[in-house]
Amino acid sequence: MGSKNKLRRFKENEKFENVIQPSREELTDNVFELKGKWSENFFKNDHPIVLELGCGKGEYTVELARKNPDKNFIGIDIKGARFWRGAKTALEEGLDNVAFIRTQIELIEYVFATNEVSEIWITFPDPQIKYKRTKHRLTNTDFLQRYKNVLKQDGIMHLKTDSEFMHGYTLGLLHGEGHEILYAHHDIYKNEYSPKEVTGIQTFYENQYLENGKPITYIRFKIK
C-alpha cells in the first residue's frame, strides 16, 4: 500500500464514528472514557460484547456482526490503515453493532473493565515461532491473564489459525495450566461437527490457505 493511500485512510478513520484511536498515554495515564461504559455510552444497548484481536482488514469482525445482530463486535489492531476497509464497510451497510479500536493488544485491560467482555476471537495471529518471540504469542500465559481480567466469568475464547505450531502450543499451554477446552480440532473443514460460526466465515487469506491445501485449526476454551 502506498504512503498516500495510507494517509488517506488515516484521515478517513479520524472521521469514522465507529473508529476509536486513543493514544497510549490516553489509556495508561488516565481512565479511558469508554472503559466499563461501552454498552451504555457507545453501543447504547446491553448486548454481549465480542472482541477480535489482531483484526487486520476487519473482515471477520464485520461478518460476525452481520450474522449476529444481537451482539456487539469490536475489532482491535494497531494498524488502522488495515481495518479502514472493515470500518468503511460497516458504515456503508449501517451495521451499528461494529466498532474498531486502534491500539496494542497488550493494553486491553486499559480499554475494557472487569466482566465487560463476553467473547474474544483470535484469528490467524502471527505464531511467533522463534523462542525469543514467545512473549509476543497472543495465547501465552501473560496474554491469557489479560483476557481473563476483562472477560465475564463464563467468557469464551476462540483461536482460529492455519498454524499447526500455534494450535499445538496453545493446546499444550491450556492443558498444562488447567484451562477448560470446550472444542478443538486440527482440521475444521474435515470435521462435520465443526461449529458453523467457525466454518461459515472465511477471510480472503483463509481462502488462500484452503486453496493451497492448508488445514485450518480451531480451539474454543475458557480461561480458569
From Swiss-Prot:
Binding residues for substrate: K130, D162
Residues annotated to bind S-adenosyl-L-methionine: E52, D77, D126
GO annotation, cellular component aspect: tRNA methyltransferase complex
Xref: Gene3D superfamilies: Vaccinia Virus protein VP39 (3.40.50.150)
Summary of the function given for this chain in its UniProt record: Catalyzes the formation of N(7)-methylguanine at position 46 (m7G46) in tRNA.
HAMAP family named in the record: tRNA_methyltr_TrmB
Protein name: tRNA (guanine-N(7)-)-methyltransferase
The organism of origin for this protein: Christiangramia forsetii (strain DSM 17595 / CGMCC 1.15422 / KT0803) (Gramella forsetii)
Lineage, broadest ranks: Bacteria, Pseudomonadati, Bacteroidota, Flavobacteriia, Flavobacteriales
Name of the gene encoding the protein in the UniProt record: trmB
